[in-house]
């Protein structure tokens, strides 16, 4: 649908996430992948979407001097927000187990911010989805972390994997946001940018 509008533009996706890359493929939006290292440090005073907004903009800053007129850069960040704490990606097995255990039997928010940057324009959007976990046993959590190694996933889990199939009883908001990108909002924003 956007192919005609995109013919004079190049979309750069600054994400190493295979899930985000697949979303763009499924949306039929061709992207150039360009991932640059960024130190994802934020002030402890930031809460919820303030964190993801800040990080998605921060990830764009390393590209600012290189962007050409016809390019649109997309950067994003996802966190799991539970009990007034942001959970990023677990650094090891023990931390993944601890994260999932803290989510068991409760609900939490998955917040994603997406930053669209061109040479003369920047827009940030964010989306929040509430996720409800059933009570999980220690054995189930151990099994999941051992077999699925969710170390590249915010909160230490992926909704589309085994743990989501057996443990998530309901969500309020976008499923795709929990996977890593509020696709409906990304599509809408790109369409608006390309039509302006």
Swiss-Prot record:
CDD domains: Maf (cd00555). Belongs to the Maf family. YhdE subfamily. It is found in: Cytoplasm. Its main location: cytoplasm. This is dTTP/UTP pyrophosphatase. PANTHER family: BIFUNCTIONAL DTTP/UTP PYROPHOSPHATASE/METHYLTRANSFERASE PROTEIN-RELATED (PTHR43213), BIFUNCTIONAL DTTP_UTP PYROPHOSPHATASE_METHYLTRANSFERASE PROTEIN-RELATED (PTHR43213:SF5). GO terms for biological process: nucleotide metabolic process. Keywords: Cytoplasm, Hydrolase, Nucleotide metabolism. The record marks 19, 78, 160 as: Important for substrate specificity. It catalyses: dTTP + H2O = dTMP + diphosphate + H(+); UTP + H2O = UMP + diphosphate + H(+). One of its GO terms (cellular component) is cytoplasm. InterPro entries: ITPase-like_fam (IPR029001), Maf-like (IPR003697). The lineage of its organism: Bacteria, Pseudomonadati, Bacteroidota, Flavobacteriia, Flavobacteriales. Its EC number is 3.6.1.9.
